[in-house]
């Protein structure tokens, strides 16, 4: 454990940020999984609805720095391609 006051404060802040980031990351993954589940079921309407709910969440996490913008773009591109294949 840290002895210096500022180091103790940073440890507390880091733990708080870690928990917040874990929560946001989990939420984002849940939205992505909903899209994959709809694709697996072969339901294009449900997949589009889930994708439209997921897209702003992923974009927001990229802007906030939780994930890289290229990772957000990759998720969206891959899911869009899979949804378009459903016909």
Swiss-Prot record:
Stretches for region Disordered: 1-26
Pfam families membership: Ribosomal_S20p
InterPro entries named among the record's database cross-references: Ribosomal_bS20, Ribosomal_bS20_sf
GO molecular function: small ribosomal subunit rRNA binding; structural constituent of ribosome
GO biological process per UniProt: translation
Entries under SUPFAM superfamilies matching the protein: Ribosomal protein S20
Source organism superkingdom: Bacteria
HAMAP family registered for this protein in UniProt: Ribosomal_bS20
Family label: Belongs to the bacterial ribosomal protein bS20 family.
Its job: Binds directly to 16S ribosomal RNA.
Record-given protein name: Small ribosomal subunit protein bS20
């Amino acid at each position: 454990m840290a002895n210096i006051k500022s180091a103790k404060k940073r440890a507390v802040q880091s733990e708080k940020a870690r928990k917040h980031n874990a929560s946001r990351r989990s939420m984002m993954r849940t939205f992505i999984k909903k899209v994959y589940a709809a694709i697996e079921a072969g339901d294009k309407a449900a997949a589009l609805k889930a994708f439209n709910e997921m897209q702003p969440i992923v974009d927001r996490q990229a802007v906030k720095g939780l994930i890289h913008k290229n990772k957000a773009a990759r998720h969206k591109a891959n899911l869009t391609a899979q949804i378009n294949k459903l016909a």
